[in-house]
């Protein structure tokens, strides 16, 4: 237990928390341009073709972002909004593309959890 005088001389060191989405540079989202849209396979116990895109952000950093939802309209040169959030079974994928903004259309025929996929409320 340090004395007060010892703490005056040398204060306690702050614990620095490492960012989980460093490419966003403390922003909630960043805009970017798709450089490549492709599918990849997940880690060991899972099996699928996950849709991902390489995105060059406005700050010049290129990241791999996951395209959530069933079906998408993205291709090379599509302008997208990228948010943080990793995909547990895809190594190196630490970002998500926001559906329903810019060039990324919302998911079709989605009735539950619509706000997460940019889907409008269906007509009665």
Curated annotation (Swiss-Prot):
GO molecular function term, any single one: tRNA binding
CC annotations in GO: small ribosomal subunit
Top-rank taxon: Bacteria
Positions bearing 3-methylthioaspartic acid: 89
RNA-binding in keyword set: yes
InterPro entries membership: NA-bd_OB-fold, Ribosomal_uS12, Ribosomal_uS12_bac
PROSITE patterns cross-referenced by the UniProt entry: RIBOSOMAL_S12
Keyword RNA-binding: yes
Keywords: Methylation, Ribonucleoprotein, Ribosomal protein, RNA-binding, rRNA-binding, tRNA-binding
GO BP terms: translation
Quaternary structure (record): Part of the 30S ribosomal subunit. Contacts proteins S8 and S17. May interact with IF1 in the 30S initiation complex.
Role noted for this protein: With S4 and S5 plays an important role in translational accuracy.
Family, similarity comment: Belongs to the universal ribosomal protein uS12 family.
Entries under NCBIfam families matching the protein: rpsL_bact (TIGR00981)
Protein name (Swiss-Prot/TrEMBL): Small ribosomal subunit protein uS12
The organism of origin for this protein: Moorella thermoacetica (strain ATCC 39073 / JCM 9320)
Classification of source organism: Bacteria, Bacillati, Bacillota, Clostridia, Moorellales
Gene (name only): rpsL
């Amino acid at each position: 237990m340090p004395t007060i005088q010892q703490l005056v001389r040398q204060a306690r060191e702050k614990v620095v928390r490492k960012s989980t989405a460093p490419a966003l540079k403390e922003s909630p989202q960043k805009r970017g341009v798709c450089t490549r849209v492709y599918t990849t396979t997940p880690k060991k116990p899972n099996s699928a073709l996950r849709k991902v895109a390489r995105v060059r952000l406005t700050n010049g950093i290129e990241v791999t972002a996951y395209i959530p939802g069933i079906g998408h309209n993205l291709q090379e040169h599509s302008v997208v909004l990228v948010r943080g959030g990793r995909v547990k079974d895809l190594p190196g994928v630490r970002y998500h593309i926001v559906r329903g903004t810019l060039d990324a259309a919302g998911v079709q025929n989605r009735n539950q959890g619509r706000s997460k996929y940019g889907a409008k409320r269906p007509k009665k």
